[in-house]
Amino acid sequence: MNRRRERVVVVGAGLAGSLVALYLARQGHEVDVFERRPDPRSALGRPEGRSINLGLSARGMRALDGVGLLADVLKHSVPMRDRVVHSPDGGIRTQPYGVREHEILHSVLREELISLVVTAAEAEPGVRFHFDSLLASLDRETGTVDVAPTAGGETRTVTADLIVGADGAFSTIRQQMQHGLRANYAQEFLPWGYKELTIPVDADGQPRVRLEALHVWPGHEAMMIAHPNRDGSLTCTLFMAHEGPVSFAALDTPTAVRDFFRQRFPDAEELMPDLVREVTEHPVGHLVTVRSDPWRYADRVVLIGDAAHAVYPFYGQGMNSAFEDCVVLDECLTAHPDRATALAAYEAARKPHTDVLADLSTANFEDLRDRVHRLGYSASAAADRLLARLLPQHWVPLYGMVAHTTIPYADALARAKRQDRILRQAGAGLALVTVLAATAALRAGRRRRANRR
């Protein structure tokens, strides 16, 4: 973007919109952010049972670090070092997230993170947030938007040099920007939805399960994931079909709720004293993947985050990839004085990789649902980690590349496929020898460290 002070309108004050406002303000621009919902820092902006906790990983951490927010955000997070898998028979299996000490995730409440980013952006000179403000229309040719109070009132027209659509998976900016263009758009709803539940602290104020981990209750017809919170509680997300014999619709009585949990998640049912009320009262959310192009129009309009590429939450990369959009857009606007060139470079740099992320997120849903509790899955993941320890410069598991590096998603998948081909070509025998050698080397290393103590 040119170095002169320009006016930017951001539509959407969620995670991506708030962070991109901060990045653009740091470039010296005047930024107005319009959001149809109330201020997320207010009680009205925090409805109960409507969010999935966030797993902050390397891409999101890099974006927050770029504006000096990472340290503050980490203070509001809980480290997740492992995935703890709960079986219906009561068995528990632990799967580390990485092979090195720093390769962990950080659990943070969505509303806390949004509040931190909004407050930081609002403190920048020239940044103004307009909550309870509904986008009425976009004129892509003139770079204007019409906005009106959600409670009713006078519509006003705002003109900007650049309009950023950060208004979510069902983006109005995207719809109006692409209207009449040779645009591609695909939307796919998962037959499953989600509902937020809680594992509170016990009577002594202590966590009921191990806190520094993501807890997973897999299942082919229903599964549950629990993120830790700083107060010792866990926020659970129950995933299952909207309709059918095993579905949210079928959990229509207290008895049905209790029987369902006792059969499928028996150890979890004991940890959730408010289970029946939460299942009965909390809303069911929808899960959608969105692919579209173009992401920009001329030098005036651009999409980021879910407005450009919504994905299922099962790889934990929705927020991280949206934050990465902010970094790449900032870099492209800095590198290219011509804004149209910058926006084209941004889309070219991001879209191939977010398309791959959509595929990875769908595949990880199937893993979490059907395979994560199987011994073969655990053995394969363990072999991957052992090879990474033995050959750190040459072997990186796919999950590690996605979560613990900023390697572009498509590049990470291509490298993982090459690694898989190597194992297949080497044959099962050589792979077993390699894993056994890696195990022996690791054990020897542990003995040496113990002797030094």
Swiss-Prot record:
Pathway: Cofactor biosynthesis; NAD(+) biosynthesis; quinolinate from L-kynurenine: step 1/3
Keyword set, alphabetical order: FAD, Flavoprotein, Monooxygenase, NADP, Oxidoreductase, Pyridine nucleotide biosynthesis
Reaction catalyzed: L-kynurenine + NADPH + O2 + H(+) = 3-hydroxy-L-kynurenine + NADP(+) + H2O
Pfam families documented for this protein: FAD_binding_3
GO biological process, alphabetically ordered: anthranilate metabolic process; kynurenine metabolic process; L-tryptophan catabolic process; NAD biosynthetic process; quinolinate biosynthetic process
EC number(s) stated in the UniProt entry for this protein: 1.14.13.9
Keyword Oxidoreductase in record: yes
Top-tier EC class: oxidoreductase
Superkingdom: Bacteria
InterPro entries for this protein: FAD-bd, FAD/NAD-bd_sf, Kynurenine_monooxygenase
Any one Gene Ontology molecular-function term assigned to this protein's record: kynurenine 3-monooxygenase activity
Cofactor: FAD
Key word Flavoprotein present: yes
SUPFAM superfamilies from the UniProt entry: FAD/NAD(P)-binding domain
Function: Catalyzes the hydroxylation of L-kynurenine (L-Kyn) to form 3-hydroxy-L-kynurenine (L-3OHKyn). Required for synthesis of quinolinic acid.
Family per record: Belongs to the aromatic-ring hydroxylase family. KMO subfamily.
Protein's recorded name: Kynurenine 3-monooxygenase
